[in-house]
């Protein structure tokens, strides 16, 4: 999957904003006043919550984001503004006497002991002013994200949706409550399974969920539903397409606080950049698997997401990695100071000589890219009887090696064009070549890189293996 450049994507986030405070420390004894633990507070920090956390997630992915909501001219509001300014999030507020919502959590040993909420109802006049502000600005954005926490800022959400639709701006909604009809006309609504079943009733199984989702889409006149299902992954159901079911990618779950914010933020950023809805959902699923490994309200950066995609591709055998995808991963590695090594070959009938060579190549740096000749390229080099193993199989075998980070195919006789594009730090070739005879060497040198020649291990050859197999078949035929 390609990671788009999100820097030109403009997203407007509107909804219930709040400040999340965290006090943490050691709980070493029980209070003599009541049967509750005493926490000796050692650390205090504040984070943006609710719709503000959605905006932070979008900013961390590199998109241009503006946040609109209702806050108070109070200390909580001041702290929230500081967090947003540090993250580069622009904001337009409706100020209200109801104040800024704050949720204070007390933790010990990463376990939440208690949460205290500071909040008042948002006045209707403030909510009306917010809807008017959205209508005035929404045309300037690629996507409108509505983050509903049922705190009162979205009393006129219908007007916001209609304003966006009139400007052909997609509307993605993270919902709340048991009345989804107020979201009529939205592009997508993203409930979790509990919120979804509150509307449609308990789902007996996955097929039942899909059927009920299709019915709800028709009833409330939206284009799609994305049902997040915790450890069961996600289900995307579109009006004019089939269902897309994604398994959960999370291996460890420490805290689900704000995970829904990350999902809607990643989905909106990807969709706003031009990706299809299914591809955007896949990206959001990867982001969710990252954020649940963090404690408290957190975000996922573009670098973290790209690294997660890298791990996902490795798990899947790299069957669909493109040059652009590998190029992106190489750039990320180099930006972190990692030395990227490049080598190439046909790798037909992978043998221990190949494995030893690749291990030695990997030791020349931190990351190893292996470029593999396509089937057509192998035929040009080896003749019509080759390859023995098709490209997909050769790539899968190579990707299973722990020394190999990324595998990418090429169609030409040499990988010179690919080398010039990827710009590795070290170019490695096996055999008795002189460095200046190696395809792509000049490109690497021009960019300050190194070229290394490694020895092949004697006695290992795919051609020799093929000859032995043919000899064995001849002998077996003669014996019969």
Swiss-Prot record:
The keyword Chaperone does not apply. Its EC number is 2.7.1.167, 2.7.7.70. Disulfide bonds: none annotated. GO terms for biological process: ADP-L-glycero-beta-D-manno-heptose biosynthetic process. Residues 1-316 are annotated as: Ribokinase. The keyword Nucleotidyltransferase applies. ATP binds at residues 192-195. It comes from the Bacteria. InterPro entries: Bifunc_HldE, Carboh/pur_kinase_PfkB_CS, Cyt_trans-like, PfkB_dom, RfaE_dom_I, RfaE_dom_II, Ribokinase-like, Rossmann-like_a/b/a_fold. One of its GO terms (molecular function) is heptose 7-phosphate kinase activity. Residues 342-480 are annotated as: Cytidylyltransferase. HAMAP family: HldE (MF_01603). Catalyzes the ADP transfer from ATP to D-glycero-beta-D-manno-heptose 1-phosphate, yielding ADP-D-glycero-beta-D-manno-heptose. This is Bifunctional protein HldE. It comes from Hydrogenovibrio crunogenus (strain DSM 25203 / XCL-2) (Thiomicrospira crunogena). The gene is hldE.
């Amino acid at each position: 999957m390609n990671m788009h450049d999100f820097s030109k994507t403009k997203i407007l986030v509107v909804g219930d904003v709040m400040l999340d405070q965290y006090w943490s420390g050691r709980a070493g004894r029980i209070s003599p006043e009541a049967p509750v633990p005493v926490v000796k507070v050692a650390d205090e920090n504040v984070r943006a919550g609710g719709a503000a956390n959605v905006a932070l997630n979008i900013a961390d992915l590199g998109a241009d984001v503006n946040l609109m909501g209702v806050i108070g001219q109070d200390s909580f509001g001041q702290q929230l503004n500081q967090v947003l300014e540090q993250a580069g999030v622009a904001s337009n507020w409706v100020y209200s006497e109801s104040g800024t919502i704050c949720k204070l959590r007390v933790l010990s040993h990463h376990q939440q002991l208690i949460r205290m909420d500071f909040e008042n109802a948002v006045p209707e006049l403030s909510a009306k002013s917010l809807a008017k502000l959205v209508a005035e600005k929404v045309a300037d954005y690629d996507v409108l994200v509505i983050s509903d926490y049922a705190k009162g800022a979205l009393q006129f959400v219908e007007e916001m949706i209609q304003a966006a639709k009139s400007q052909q701006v997609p509307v993605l909604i993270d919902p709340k409550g048991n009345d989804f009809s107020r979201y009529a006309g939205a592009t997508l609504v993203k409930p979790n399974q509990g919120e979804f079943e509150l509307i449609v009733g308990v789902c007996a199984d996955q097929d039942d969920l899909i059927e009920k989702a299709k019915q709800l889409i028709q009833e409330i006149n939206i284009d799609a539903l994305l049902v997040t299902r915790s450890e069961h992954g996600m289900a995307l159901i579109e009006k004019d397409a089939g269902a897309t079911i994604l398994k959960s990618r999370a291996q460890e779950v420490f805290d689900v606080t704000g995970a829904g914010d990350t999902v809607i933020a990643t989905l909106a950023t990807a969709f706003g950049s031009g990706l299809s809805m299914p591809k955007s959902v896949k990206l959001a699923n990867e982001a969710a698997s990252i954020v649940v490994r963090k404690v408290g309200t957190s975000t996922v950066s573009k670098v973290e997401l790209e690294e997660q995609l890298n791990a996902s591709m490795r798990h899947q055998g790299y069957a669909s990695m493109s040059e652009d995808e590998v190029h992106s991963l190489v750039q990320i590695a180099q930006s972190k100071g990692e030395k990227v090594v490049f080598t190439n070959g046909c790798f037909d009938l992978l043998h221990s000589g190949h494995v030893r060579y690749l291990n030695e190549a990997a030791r020349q740096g931190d990351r190893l890219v292996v470029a593999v000749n396509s089937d057509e390229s192998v035929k040009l080099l080896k003749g019509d009887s080759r390859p023995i193993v098709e490209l997909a199989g050769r790539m899968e075998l190579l990707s299973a090696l722990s020394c190999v980070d990324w595998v990418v195919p090429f169609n030409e006789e040499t990988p010179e064009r690919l080398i010039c594009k990827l710009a590795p730090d070290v170019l490695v070739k096996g055999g008795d070549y002189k460095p200046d005879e190696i395809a792509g060497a000049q490109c690497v040198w021009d960019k300050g890189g190194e070229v290394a020649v490694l020895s092949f291990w004697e006695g290992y050859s795919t051609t020799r293996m093929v000859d032995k197999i043919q000899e064995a078949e001849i002998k077996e035929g003669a014996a019969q």
